[in-house]
Amino acid sequence: MKTRSSSDLTLGALLGDFRLLLTLFIGFRLLLLLAYQPVYTQGVERGVSAGGDLFYYYLLGGFSADGLLPFRDWWSEFPPIPHFLTVILYQATARAGYSGFAMLYGLLMLAFDLGNLILMRRMGRRLYGANTGMALAWIYALMIAPTVFIWWNFEPMVAFVLLLSLAALLGKRETRSALWAGVGALIKFTPALILGAVWRFRAPARALRYTAIVAAVFGSVYGLLFAQNATMTLPSLTAQFNKSSYQTVWALLDGNYRTGNFGTPQERLDPANANVLTGNPSVIPGIVRLGIAAAVGLFVFARARRFDDKGLVAFVTITLLIFFLQAQGWSPQWLVQIIPLVLLCFPTRDGVTAVVLLSAVTFAEYPFLWLRTGDIGGAMSGALVTPFVILVLARTTILVGLCVGLYRRLREEAVIRTED
């Protein structure tokens, strides 16, 4: 009779070994980088970064070679952290060209995504137990969307700060959570949406203090930027809202079949270009969309009955999805924020299926369908319009379905809220 050695590997031991998961997670992404190194040659971008925004970031970082800096000499549609980071990475890899820049950028995003994996396990363990936390980490590691966007843009950094703020809030470390939410708002505005959950799940005095910390972090940085050059700083707060609609049901109503890309890097030297409308004006004004979203949000706010940790995560998730649904545009990289939150809310086969379907629809639209236009910044026309419309409607249906599921989760049971 054979005896099993203590060194023999079993399925349970393998799947329960977090160090092994980290090794596979990092190793797969590094090997992908080695096999498909990012290059730009003869006017064509190739490698793992092809189809993303890194080459555009590289061109923006190139302004610094002439002494031109973001928020002083050129405007950005994002808060300050992303493009100041771009300048730092450009300067650090100036002699290595685009390949060096893209590889360093991707490695930094890999570090953030590694943090996302660790936070998924930690929060999953807190919400559902150790086994489910480990299972969620494995599922996240196998998701293709976060892997792709490591090499395409800075969305893993946004998701990391959002999850870090949420994890701190779950641990009742509210000051730390507020600080991270404030930092997150300096990357993208979405991490600040956690404020809605704070006001619903914490006493008013604590929520007010939390809000004040977020505002202080955000306001102190923007105060310095406005003092330096208000004209070049203002577009970071307004440009996204001044764009015409794109890749949403709102865009279909407006007859806009284009992406939401801004113009060439050189156009950012003139702040007037931040307000140039490149498509048809909105049939439904932005203020109306915001009003509808606010009404839906207030309805959920008033009807929520679940005040445990699972309810808190569900509330943050539905807030994020409502915001994305009301937005005039859709960006594929938002998957990086959506996927971990949905998995934390629905650690089931249905939850995994939902994020896989959402990812499939998103990538079928971009890059698959957009590449058929011959210009990823171009417009849908002819035979491409029908599949484009179908994909937009399918994605919207999935997001609405997730919101319905989250609302039901928030209505499941009445848990008495207690304050520490």
Predicted features by range, described:
Residues 2-246, 283-420:
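Multi-pass membrane glycosyltransferase architecture that uses lipid-linked
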Residues 239-288:
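Membrane-lumen/periplasm interface segments of multi-pass, membrane-embedded glycan/lipid transferases
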